[in-house]
Amino acid sequence: MERRSRTAEVLEVGDDLNIRAAGSRDELEQAYRLVYLSFLQREYIQASASELRLSFFNALPETVTFIADLRGEIIATVTLVPDSPAGLPMDEIYRHEIQALRDQGRRLAEVTMLADRRHEMRRALPVVLLLMKRVFDYSTLVLKANDLCITINPRHETYYRRFLLFQQLGGLKSYPSVRNNPALAERLDLDRVREECEGNDRLLTQFFTDRTPMGTLRERYMMTAEDVQRFFVELTDTFREAPADKITYLTRLHPEYPWGQWRP
């Protein structure tokens, strides 16, 4: 009998799992809470009254949160942040490395806020791969991005390089946003990834060549002003703590928001 590939083994996931962009305020809130619980368990953050983990970048209109929905329960999530004048989350510690890509004229997007209810990469890997497939398709087909960037804990480096073909972008650093836990910057060159996967197992090749239908990719929930107020003003202090230049950028995008009330 032919030995199955490791990729085939990790991709054995039931048909009841639905990978898609969050479709409502409630699903976004569930996703933010799952990230909070996952990060709290890993000691990336301290406990907070809101029990939500989100940042200024979640308020940007181009940011997309993807979810793994298992019979109505969100069991995993990841967020994709396209580059903009507001920058990327990882600019906090990898500004030089990210700017070098920008200076080459490359279009960037960052993968962030990855969480699974199992809190362990080895067990979560099948669902993580399916989420990353949707991220990959959205980045290439909708954003027309050249690179996917991510900061990871060094202990997960093997997974990202073996299964997703990421390569190192920046060296080991402490990340203040996750209580100074260690981080590595990784990059996936979307322009060359199909060449890179040649010679790998068949399912890995399919991962990077099969395409999610465009109509499915574009289905996503856009936050209303009420949603923004709830998440970033009422439940958290995100807007009050955000740097002035980032709020100025968001104000230009959404002048209709009641900024005088939100940041008096």
Task: Indicate residue ranges for each PLM-predicted region.
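Short, His- and charge-rich active-site/binding loops that engage polyanionic ligands
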Residues: 67-102
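Acyl-donor binding region in acyl/amide transferases
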Residues: 88-192
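C-terminal non-catalytic accessory extensions
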Residues: 240-264
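Secondary-structure boundary elements
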Residues: 27, 41, 70-71, 137-146
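Short amphipathic alpha-helix that is part of the acyltransferase structural core
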Residues: 5-57, 65-67, 74
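Acyltransferase donor/substrate-recognition loop-hinge adjacent to the catalytic core
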Residues: 2-7, 99-102, 194
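Charge-rich, low-complexity intrinsically disordered segments
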Residues: 113, 180-249
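Short acidic (Asp/Glu) patches
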Residues: 48-55, 59-62, 87-100
